[in-house]
């Protein structure tokens, strides 16, 4: 094959490969369009159903309220009518009885006048006596029309106007949720979730973060508050989890629509304390350690992590949930190894902070000092690689200098310094040492 033919063949192969890549990219974009269309149509369908359900429930509730109010007013009418008519009925019975008595008296009087002369005197005497007993000049009092109820209903259009105004402002349709998840960052045994507001007209008062496993249908609350990030812990590594966030506007009680769920996971094993160390009791997840009084009084020991799970670029946090008596040897920190021949992290190949706030680098105390550690204190360690000076370029781990820039934060203060190690390390241990019982520390 000639050189020209080989060149053409090579060009053809490159064109085929480019076409395959182009087709693959287009297919991915078609899939993206399909997902976008599915989201639009799916969310539109769900929104229609939500609107119809809400307004149907509202209509039913308002109708029930109106019917209840109508029945209440009708009952008031019935009560007033009954209370007002009852004395009128009694008066009517009294008058009708008087009319009946007067009719009977008239008949007797007319009969007495028409009787014979011999009976006239007796009949007229009896009639006159009976007429005097009846008291023909005594009449019952009949109330005037102004003294009896004349019922009416006071109705105006203010409720209708107010209802119309409220209905006109009730509900809204948004093309996007007011908040969205901005970033998912894996952390040991968890995922750091960051979110942000995307609606400039929305003023959030609180945020609400939920998560679930990808194979579960039930979300659970992870955080409610004003922060825009939260570390969700106790997640199994290499397991997908879905995260979503919503917000509550200022002065509102209802939550906004949920953000579009984002999938995240962690590949990093959770930070755990080493079990079985004398003088320390661990929680079931091994992320909380409590200094007990099982060891000899006044003699502490260092509790290390179960394995070197801290990597540069991460933030390691110690949170003090209970405190005991302090000792100058107490410490929290990070180290290159897990030596057991020492009772404190204030040693070589370690950086730490003591409970009085003193900072130690390779066993030497720095001049800078942080606030003392008490209940509720959170101490953070951040590290980044500054420089690497290996002796053997073919094997960097074989001797040389390894420099890390360390930032220790406590309270509202922090110290920054360079930590020189004599070997390159991919990961580091963390540890704590307390001389007296009562201390409890959570690591994450």
UniProtKB/Swiss-Prot annotation:
This is Cytokine receptor-like factor 3. Belongs to the cytokine receptor-like factor 3 family. Signal peptide: none annotated. One of its GO terms (molecular function) is DNA binding. Keywords: Coiled coil, Cytoplasm. May play a role in the negative regulation of cell cycle progression. InterPro entries: FN3_dom, FN3_sf, Ig-like_fold. It comes from Danio rerio. It is found in: Cytoplasm. Its main location: cytoplasm. Residues 177-270 form the Fibronectin type-III domain. PROSITE patterns: FN3. Residues 1-65 form a coiled coil. One of its GO terms (cellular component) is nucleus.
């Amino acid at each position: 094959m000639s050189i020209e033919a080989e060149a053409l063949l090579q060009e053809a192969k490159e064109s085929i490969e480019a076409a395959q890549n182009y087709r693959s990219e287009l297919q991915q974009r078609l899939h993206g369009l399909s997902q976008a269309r599915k989201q639009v149509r799916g969310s539109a369908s769900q929104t229609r159903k939500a609107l119809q359900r809400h307004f149907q429930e509202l209509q039913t509730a308002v109708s029930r309220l109106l019917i209840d109010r109508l029945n209440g007013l009708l009952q008031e009418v019935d009560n007033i009518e009954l209370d007002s008519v009852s004395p009128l009925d009694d008066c009517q019975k009294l008058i009708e009885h008087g009319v009946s008595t007067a009719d009977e008296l008239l008949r007797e009087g007319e009969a007495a006048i028409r009787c014979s002369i011999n009976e006239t005197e007796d009949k007229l005497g009896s009639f006159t006596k009976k007429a005097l007993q009846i008291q023909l000049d005594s009449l019952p009092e009949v109330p005037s029309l102004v003294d009896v109820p004349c019922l009416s209903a006071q109705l105006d259009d203010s409720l209708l106007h107010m209802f119309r105004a409220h209905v006109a402002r009730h509900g809204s349709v948004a093309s996007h949720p007011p908040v969205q998840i901005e970033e998912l960052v894996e952390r040991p045994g968890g995922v750091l979730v960051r979110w942000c507001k995307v609606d400039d007209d929305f003023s959030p008062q609180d945020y609400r973060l939920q998560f679930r496993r990808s194979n579960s249908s039930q979300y659970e609350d992870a955080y409610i508050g004003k922060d825009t990030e939260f570390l969700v812990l106790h997640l199994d590594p290499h397991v997908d989890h879905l995260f979503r966030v919503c917000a509550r506007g200022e002065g509102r009680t209802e939550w906004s629509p949920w953000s579009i769920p984002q999938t995240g996971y962690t590949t990093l094993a959770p930070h755990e304390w080493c079990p079985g160390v004398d003088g320390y009791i661990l929680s079931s997840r091994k992320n909380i350690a409590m200094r007990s009084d099982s060891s000899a009084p006044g003699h502490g020991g260092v509790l290390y992590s179960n394995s070197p799970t801290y990597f540069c670029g991460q933030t390691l946090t110690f949170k003090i949930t209970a405190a005991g008596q302090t000792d100058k040897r107490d410490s929290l920190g990070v180290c290159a190894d897990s030596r057991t021949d020492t009772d404190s992290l204030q040693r070589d190949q370690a950086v730490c902070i003591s409970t009085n706030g003193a900072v130690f680098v390779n066993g030497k105390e720095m001049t800078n000092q942080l606030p003392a550690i008490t209940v509720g204190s959170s101490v953070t360690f951040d590290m980044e690689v500054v420089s690497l000076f290996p002796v053997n370029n073919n094997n960097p781990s074989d001797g040389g200098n390894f420099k890390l820039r360390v930032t220790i934060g406590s309270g509202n203060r922090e110290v920054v310094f360079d930590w020189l190690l004599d070997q390159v390390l991919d990961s580091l241990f963390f540890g704590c040492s307390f001389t007296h019982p009562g201390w409890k520390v959570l690591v994450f």
